[in-house]
Amino acid sequence: MVIGDLKEPGRINVLKYSIADGPHATIEPNRTCNIRCHNCYNLDRDVVKSFEAVKSEIDLVARKRNLQVITILGGEPTLHPELDQIISYIKSKKILCHVLTNGLRLLDDPEGRYLDGLVRAGMDKILVHIDSGQSHVYRDVEEARRTLFSRLEARKVPFSLSVTITNEDQGGLAGLAKRYAKYKYFDGILAVVARDPLPPNIQKVELSDEYRSLARNLGIEPSSYIPSNLSDRDVNWLIYSYFINPLTGEAFPISPLFDRLHRRARKLASGRHAFVFPPKPSFHEMISAGVCLADTIVHPRKWPAFRRFLRSGSLLRAGRFHYIAIQTPPEVDEQLKKLRFCYGCPDATIRNGMLTPVCIADLINPLNGNQGHVEVNKDWYREVYSAMGELYL
């Protein structure tokens, strides 16, 4: 997708942080997992790092980036025996801590003792990755989500849904956003379109199709985007910020102008760029009507959307502040013969001491030196690490 595909390409914010100013990173304490996702990018599934090794990676990435948040992923992070200590160590750095999980261990613990331990350790939010790509584990994906969401809601734990959009799931984000708006501590969706940098003939999901679907079915336009390493015209992340009425499912999109002001205010207040806006459900409900009214006054064309948004709501508690972020994984540009990936890689991890895009780390810098059946692409290695500031050509 390119910026010209958007309805108003001149208005949208471009989030193009320097490597040092990047507000987000990921940590992989273990590569082991208890399921197999159809589109998983992990090739090495045997490594479990020691707590000391993970601490060293946290220290290193905190020196390389001005972090607001670290997301712990894997593998499946709940399999690491010291996950609670890892969370506590991240929090000791004054950094927000999110955990991306397939939810299996949490669902197998109906009393929630393990979840309670993560909360006590300081976990700020859970990203729940349960989708149709795991249907071999969850016979009823919707039932699994509802069960886990209810447990998180009861404990007032903020949570998002993480999904991979396959050809069978295209156009479904609006329905998910409306369906889960009823949960007070649900704050949005992180989606990845199914693509792969290796197979040349794989049928790929297009980001532009999801953009049109959200405009048609939820009535929202994106407020910001992240370009690729090759061109600012490329749209590799598409980010929506909006308020949603949980009673009616009507959404009110936050304009790029208000999104820009919000981000600048956060930067001035904290000295860091905002990768996420920490969920504050009651506060956001209280200010929702006022923010939407102010946005409408500045952009009068939004009056119809504002009226629909308030329908069946209250001026004091009209809606909830949510996000949708859609990512396009790395792929080879057939014309330039170069690897296209997100500018600055918002999801970078530490791989063998180097800041590395997590979704291609196994292809360019595997933990064990090689993957046996996959040869390290030296051209990609040079391209990626020069773009990430780790290699000077």
Question: Where are the predicted features?
Answer:
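N-terminal capping/interface segment
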Residues: 5-9, 31, 40, 96-98, ...
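Canonical Radical SAM [4Fe-4S] cluster-binding loop centered on the CxxxCxxC motif
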Residues: 16-53, 64-65
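Conserved, mostly hydrophobic/aromatic
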Residues: 33, 99, 353
